[in-house]
Each structure stands twice: as structure tokens, then as C-alpha cells.
């Protein structure tokens, strides 16, 4: 029943496409490269160190390629596995109501973001291995008074390592493990000694994760004082608790909170959290003991995402649904235990309440999963609840610009820049729209603003260089394109544009390796293949140029320019019988496009 419910609830997302940074995981990532595993595991090329998660995506790329169904289906299966493991763990720990807790977790709307967003695979993997860690430790006697270093203990240590290699935010788990020992008995020196390796791994990976966050991104994420971060942490805890208890109006990008240092009110949530904790502590001898443990577990597992250290997503919002994926199980376990007590007292009422609650949560999750059917639907839903999300305006503008809806895209880019004038990528995106719509002067102004705001933004240098070349400023354009590639050597569009600039300046032989590198980085890059075919002919390699263009039209049969250029090269080679159909195909495609 549990797995069937998971499949039914999340099925609307299975047929969804890529959203937000999903594209980046595959378009410009080592996941597509044959040597990707080396870079994923043994280098600092990636912005974050989640090699187990990245390895699953690397393997799946070999199975599904750019088709999203397989990735979504894997996420769904992983979430079903999480729910089953949670049931098994809670039963092993002797918690009543374990199945109800697992059901609530399986269908809770807050989890939709982790399941439906491919890039959040890391949450699912980390949770899966974290639960395996607890289950194996329970088999090793963690809470039974005979905790020992047997094979189950070794498996638990391995599972925890894999959890950290999936996502380092699982690092607080050893504190929860110590709490589980404390729940059962007074921890002994042997208990502490056996848990010490878990704490060692947690500290090491926490430091590693902070290093990647600090070195993987150069922009300032949050310019907030230590006091502001502490006060903000109190707000974050209550926000997540509210969404766990009443999961309504869930969106991808929540409004960012102002934390004015001089306003005493920002400290009220933290004070309330401290007072609530103190009250639970004083009442711990009675029925509140379980509530104290759940509250402490919830807060401890939230520590990595409370804002004490920077996470790149916090540029846009301090909170996100997927951040509480690991923490929320403590609250749901408490709910399951409470339901079990109620069921023993009023079985019919408790059963009816469970059915209604699970049904309501499942309905909300099914509706929420439907928002992930495509990126446009997701961003429009975000803007309905958070109309001042400059990121949602920018991303929607990018989608509509790609679809040729230039006026609407421009309006969203302008709105994004009104909300955040210092958003360099937004200026660069608006510049691309101006350039593509035949307004080079406006495009140059936007690109120059972007470069001024963020000199290391390769996109802006690429756009500026390409527009300069198109407007006759060849040498200046070449310099900008080379700067883009200095900043981001694995940038296929910039390689292609540099090849075009070199070809335009008559350096045909120098253009060839640029096109070849663009195709190596992005094999499904028809413009680079077309340009390479033409350029090979210019360097006296006519036969190679024909072969290249034949490959382009085979892979992209609707590419009119490639058909036309193939016709030209076949004509030059004296192969008129083959050239004529190529010209006719190009003419037909261009006529159909009018």
C-alpha cells in the first residue's frame, strides 16, 4: 500500500522536465563526460562534493541521456525506499505507530520538492543511507544495552560515510545517535567510544562542505552579521515547523526576510524557541519526554541549513522545502506515536483521523507534484505566491526568450533587475535578448553592466564578445571571448563564438580547433558542427567538411542552414545528384519556418 501510494501521489512529476539547475547538472557538468567519475570523486572541479549522488546521475546518463523520465522514476523509487526504511527503523527502535509515521512521510507535501526536482536527488540518497545507518546500529545494539563493534556496526559506519558522500548536511546525525542511546540508558564510555568515528566523519565532511561552499562560489551569498544569522536561525526553525504541521502555499522560492540589526523583534522567534525548549526540558519526566526528543532531533538536523554558514541557494531565499527533508522525520515519528496512543483509546476515531490526514496530505502532494511538469508552470506558481522573486522572473524570462517570446521575456528580465539591480546574470540575460532581437547597442550596454558588476561572469564576456564581433569590433570581441574561456574553459558556446570570430577575421585554421572543442564539450551542438563543416572546406578539407555536415543533418534533420551548406559543398565536389536534394530540403525547411 505504501509504495502504491507513493507512486500515485508523485506520478504527475515523473513526466516532468528539467527545472532550474537540473539543466546545469547535465549540460555543463562532468556527468556527461566519459572521465566524469574521476572529476566527480578526485578533483575540486564541482561546486559541491556529493560524489555518490553525482555517480548515480553519471550512470543514469548512460541509460536515459537527456530524457527526464528515468531520473524522475529513480527519485520516486528512492523516496518509496525511504518510507519503507523509516517504517523499519521506527519498528526496530520499538516506536508505536511506525507505519503511520512512514505513511505521513511518504505523502507529505514538503517532500515533493526533493522528489520532483532531479537535482535534489542528494536529499533522497542522504536520507536513505542515514536510515540504513540507524537501522544497522540498532541491529548492533545501539539502544539495547549491548552495543558492540560487530558486522552491523561496520555496515552502519559504511552507510554513514555513503550518506555524507551523498550530501554533507546529514552530518548532525551522530548527535541524534547519541540521543537515542541517552533515551535508552545513560551513555557509557564504550558507547561514546563506538560513536566517536561517526563524530569524526561528521566533522571532517562538515569542514569539507564549508570549504566547497566558500571556494565553489565567488559571489557574496549573504552579507549578514553573526547576530543577524543567530536571530534568523530562530525564524527558520519556526518556519519549517509551520510547514511541517500545515503544508500550504509551498513554493520553490520563498520571500527573503529582512533582518534589520536594530530591530529587537527579530530576536523574538529565537527567544520563543529557547522558552519552548526550556519548557519541554522541565516537563521531560512525563509525557513530554518524546516531544522533547523529537523537538531536539528536529532542531539538530536543521543546524546545517539555519544560515550559520552560507549555502548558495540562500542568495535567493533563506528557506526551502528540501532543507527540512532530513529533519522532518522526528516530528512525524512523534505524530505516529501520538496516533498509536489515541488508537489504543479511541480506535475508530484514530483510524478515521489517520485516513483523512493521509488523504489530505496525499491530495496536496499530488497537486504540488503537478507544478513540476515543466519549469514554466513552476515559476508561474512561484510568482503567484512571491511576485517579488527576482530569480523566478529571471528564469521565466530565460524560458520565454528561448521560446521566442521576446517581449514577455524582456519584461520579466526588466522586472528582475528592478528588484535586484546588481544581478549581473540578469543584465547578461537581458543583453542576450536584445542581441537576438536586433538591438545591439542596448545589448552592449547590458553586457558591459554585467561585466562591471561581476567581472568573472563568463556568460557576460561571451555575450559582449559575440556582440562586439557582430558589430564590427573584431579585436575587442576576440579579447572578450578569450576572457570568457579563461574564466570557463569548458564553455562550448564561447568556443563556437570564438571560432566564428576567428573565421570572420580570416583565421580559418585557428577556428577549426575551437569548433572541435565545442563539439567535444557538447556533442549535440548543431551550430558548432555546421560551422566546423564550412570551415573545414575553407582550409582545403572538403571531403571532411562534407562528412561533418552529413552527420549534422543526420542528427538534426530540421536544420536548414546545415542542409544548404551541405548542398554547397557537394556542388563544389561535383556531386550534383546529391547536392540538389540537399538544396531542396533546405528550401522546404525555410519555407515551413516562415
Give the role of each language-model region.
Residues 564, 571-592:
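TPR/TPR-like (Sel1-like) alpha-helical repeat modules
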Amino acid at each position: 500500500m505504501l509504495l502504491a501510494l507513493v507512486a500515485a501521489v508523485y506520478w504527475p512529476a515523473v513526466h516532468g522536465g528539467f527545472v532550474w539547475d537540473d539543466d546545469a547538472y547535465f549540460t555543463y557538468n562532468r556527468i556527461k563526460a566519459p572521465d566524469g567519475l574521476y572529476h566527480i570523486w578526485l578533483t575540486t572541479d564541482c561546486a559541491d562534493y556529493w560524489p555518490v549522488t553525482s555517480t548515480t546521475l553519471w550512470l543514469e546518463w548512460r541509460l536515459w541521456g537527456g530524457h527526464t523520465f528515468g531520473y524522475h522514476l529513480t527519485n520516486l523509487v528512492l523516496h518509496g525506499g525511504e518510507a519503507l526504511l523509516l517504517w523499519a527503523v521506527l519498528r526496530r527502535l520499538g516506536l508505536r505507530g511506525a507505519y503511520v509515521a512512514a505513511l505521513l512521510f511518504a505523502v507529505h507535501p514538503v517532500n515533493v520538492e526533493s522528489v520532483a526536482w532531479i537535482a535534489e536527488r542528494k536529499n533522497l540518497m542522504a536520507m536513505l543511507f542515514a536510515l540504513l545507518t540507524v537501522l544497522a546500529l540498532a541491529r548492533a545494539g545501539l539502544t539495547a544495552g549491548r552495543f558492540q563493534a560487530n558486522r552491523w556496526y561496520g555496515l552502519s559506519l559504511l552507510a554513514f560515510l555513503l550518506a555524507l558522500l551523498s550530501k554533507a548536511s546529514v552530518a548532525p546525525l551522530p548527535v541524534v545517535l547519541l540521543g537515542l542511546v541517552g533515551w535508552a540508558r545513560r551513555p557509557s564510555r564504550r558507547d561514546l567510544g563506538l560513536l566517536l568515528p561517526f563524530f569524526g566523519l561528521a566533522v571532517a565532511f562538515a569542514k569539507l562542505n564549508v570549504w566547497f561552499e566558500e571556494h565553489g562560489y565567488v559571489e557574496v551569498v549573504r552579507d549578514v552579521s553573526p547576530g543577524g544569522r543567530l536571530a534568523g536561525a530562530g525564524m527558520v526553525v519556526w518556519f519549517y515547523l509551520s510547514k511541517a504541521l500545515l503544508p500550504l502555499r509551498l513554493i520553490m522560492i520563498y520571500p527573503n526576510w529582512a533582518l534589520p540589526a536594530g530591530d529587537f523583534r527579530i530576536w523574538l522567534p529565537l527567544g520563543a524557541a529557547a522558552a519552548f525548549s526550556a519548557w519541554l526540558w522541565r516537563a521531560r519526566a512525563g509525557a513530554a519526554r518524546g516531544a522533547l526528543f523529537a523537538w531536539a532531533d528536529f532542531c539538530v538536523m536543521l543546524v546545517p541549513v539555519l544560515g550559520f554558514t552560507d549555502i548558495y541557494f540562500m542568495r535567493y531565499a533563506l528557506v526551502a522545502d528540501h532543507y527540512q527533508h532530513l529533519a522532518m522525520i522526528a516530528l512525524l515519528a512523534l505524530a505516529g506515536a501520538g496516533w498509536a496512543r489515541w488508537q489504543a483509546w479511541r480506535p475508530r476515531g484514530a483510524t478515521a483521523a489517520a485516513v483523512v490526514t493521509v488523504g489530505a496530505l496525499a491530495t496536496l502532494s499530488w497537486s504540488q507534484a503537478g507544478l513540476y511538469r515543466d519549469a514554466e508552470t513552476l515559476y508561474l506558481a512561484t510568482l503567484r505566491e512571491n511576485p517579488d522573486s527576482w530569480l523566478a522572473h529571471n528564469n521565466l524570462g530565460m524560458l520565454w526568450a528561448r521560446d521566442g517570446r521576446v517581449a514577455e521575456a524582456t519584461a520579466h528580465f526588466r522586472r528582475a533587475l528592478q528588484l535586484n539591480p546588481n544581478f549581473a546574470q540578469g543584465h547578461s540575460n537581458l543583453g542576450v535578448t536584445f542581441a537576438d532581437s536586433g538591438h545591439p547597442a542596448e545589448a552592449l550596454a547590458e553586457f558591459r553592466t554585467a561585466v562591471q558588476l561581476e567581472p568573472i561572469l563568463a556568460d557576460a564576456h561571451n555575450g559582449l564578445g559575440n556582440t562586439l564581433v557582430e558589430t564590427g569590433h573584431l579585436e575587442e570581441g576576440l579579447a572578450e571571448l578569450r576572457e570568457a574561456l579563461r574564466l570557463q574553459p569548458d564553455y562550448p558556446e564561447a568556443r563556437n563564438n570564438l571560432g566564428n570570430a576567428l573565421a570572420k577575421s580570416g583565421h580559418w585554421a585557428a577556428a577549426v580547433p575551437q569548433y572541435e572543442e565545442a563539439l567535444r564539450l557538447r556533442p549535440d551542438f548543431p551550430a558548432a558542427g555546421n560551422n566546423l563543416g564550412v570551415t573545414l572546406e575553407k582550409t582545403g578539407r572538403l571531403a571532411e567538411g562534407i562528412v561533418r555536415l552529413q552527420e549534422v543533418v543526420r542528427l538534426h534533420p530540421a536544420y536548414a542552414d546545415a542542409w544548404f551548406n551541405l548542398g554547397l559543398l557537394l556542388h563544389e565536389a561535383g556531386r550534383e545528384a546529391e547536392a540538389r536534394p540537399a538544396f531542396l530540403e533546405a528550401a522546404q525547411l525555410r519555407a515551413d519556418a516562415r
